[in-house]
Amino acid sequence: MNRQNNNLMFQYAAVIIAFLIALFGVTLFFAGHYTPGGGFVGGLLLSCALTIIAIAFDIKTMEKVFPWDFKILIGIGLLFCVATPLASWFYGENFFTHTEFNIPLPLLQPVHMNTPMFFDFGVLCAVVGTIMTIIITIGESE
C-alpha cells in the first residue's frame, strides 16, 4: 500500500465518507447500553473510517494524520474494561454494579454519566486497536 494514488476525487470522497462513518460510530457509541450500539459497533465503524483513509491515501499518511500506537490503544481499552467492574467492587457494591452520576459544568447543565459508558469506551478502544493493528500489519507486508 505504499504506492501513491493520485485519484483526487476518490481521496476527497474518502475523507467525507470517513468523517460521516466516524460521526455515526460516535453516535452509536453514545447511544449504546440503552439502545442498540455501544463500544463494539462504534469501534467497528471508527476502524472502518480509518481503513478508508488508509486505502484512499496510504498507511503512512494515515499514521501521520492519526499518530496513535494502536497496540497501546488495546491496552488502554483493556484497562478500562477491567477497571470499571473493579471500581464498583472496591466501593463495596457487587461486581459490575452500574452507577449513575452527574458532572457539574459551569454555565451549563450537568452532564449525566454512568459506568457502562466507561466499559463501552474500553471495548471501543480495544476493538479499534485490534482491527487497526491487523490492517496495518497486513498493509505493511505488501
From Swiss-Prot:
Keywords: Antiport, Cell membrane, Hydrogen ion transport, Ion transport, Membrane, Sodium, Sodium transport, Transmembrane, Transmembrane helix, Transport. It is found in: Cell membrane. It comes from Staphylococcus haemolyticus (strain JCSC1435). One of its GO terms (molecular function) is monoatomic cation transmembrane transporter activity. GO terms for biological process: proton transmembrane transport; sodium ion transport. The chain crosses the membrane at residues 12-32, 37-57, 72-92, 118-138. NCBIfam families: 2a6301s02, PRK12573.1. Belongs to the CPA3 antiporters (TC 2.A.63) subunit B family. This is Na(+)/H(+) antiporter subunit B1. May form a heterooligomeric complex that consists of seven subunits: mnhA1, mnhB1, mnhC1, mnhD1, mnhE1, mnhF1 and mnhG1. It is a multi-pass membrane protein. InterPro entries: CPA3_antiporter_subunitB, CPA3_sub_B, MnhB. Its main location: membrane. GO terms for cellular component: plasma membrane. Mnh complex is a Na(+)/H(+) antiporter involved in Na(+) excretion. It comes from the Bacteria.
